[in-house]
Amino acid sequence: MSQNQASSPADAKPATAISRIAALIPGILLCIAVAGVSALLERAELGVFEHPYVEALVMAILLGMALRSFWKPAPRWQAGIAFSAKQLLEVAVMLLGASISFAAIAASGIALLASIAAVVVIALCVSFGLSRLLGLSTRLSILIACGNSICGNSAIAAVAPIIGANNDEIASSISFTAILGVMMVLGLPLLIPLLQLSATQYGILAGLTVYAVPQVLAATVPAGLVSTQIGTLVKLMRVLMLGPVVVGLSLVASRWQSDAKKTNVGFFRLVPWFILGFLALATLRSLEIVPSTVVGPVTKITSFLTVVSMAALGLGVDVRVLANVGGRVTAAVTLSLMLLLGISIALVHWFK
């Protein structure tokens, strides 16, 4: 057999995997570098002011956005940046489960569960109504309502095939989400002293208003571990509302979507892998299979991954995108989010 014979498909698979991993390295290293500078600046603040007024997590977003505003990363950087912004942050969310006991849910009681469901339903109705009043199509209004009220782009991706939304409607509904998501992560902690919120209250507020589970983690880190735990639990409960919403929309859409193909939404579209991992680790922690000595190291790893991911998030946000977003879509998304924030602020004062 000739030594020059072409390699078999089996030999090609490892090479393909290695090349994919290699493609991630430049972008990941860039995000780590931005995160490292952010950590150094936080230490400098601590040395000068004796308090980090702008924490590394927020600094990483701001530095990433500043860098992105005058330098568009070349394609060789993009894969690693995207991986850091999504997968690394999802891993951080999953690991957070190791520090949470389901006793926190039991302590909150049925009132919190009912309140979360009520907020989601009210937000869905108000967001849809506002979007329609602003002249947006029914499908686009549904996408905006689900994205704002449940879990951002994940909800939009799950609902879009159910209602037969086209690419333009999907793009319009998600184009403003990245920027608003960053604004919420940066701005929400400012409400802690302004509204004199406790750690529990702020966690509930973040869980009710921030778009995605990973972003809740980022928004609550400045308020401490208790706030992060509560916020993540509230957000997970909110995400679970996606199932009933999709079922309801499927029943409604089947009546006026006769010309479109019926699409089944898979289980992992409704419940992402990192949420399942979070719940699994939380279960193990509640059963004390995961010992308390693990919580400290896991929390440090989670914090590191979160800062790296926030650097990636900043690097992926181009504020100039605002110029390309339609005025009515921008108004609908912004007003809906403000109303959701107002409802949530009123609610959290019930919980101490």
From Swiss-Prot:
InterPro entries: UPF0324_pro. It holds the Pfam family Cons_hypoth698. This is UPF0324 membrane protein blr3189. One of its GO terms (cellular component) is plasma membrane. Belongs to the UPF0324 family. Keywords: Cell membrane, Membrane, Transmembrane, Transmembrane helix. It comes from the Bacteria. It is found in: Cell membrane. It is a multi-pass membrane protein. It comes from Bradyrhizobium diazoefficiens (strain JCM 10833 / BCRC 13528 / IAM 13628 / NBRC 14792 / USDA 110). The keyword Transmembrane applies. The chain crosses the membrane at residues 21-43, 53-71, 88-110, 114-136, 143-165, 175-197, 204-226, 236-253, 265-284, 294-316, 329-351.
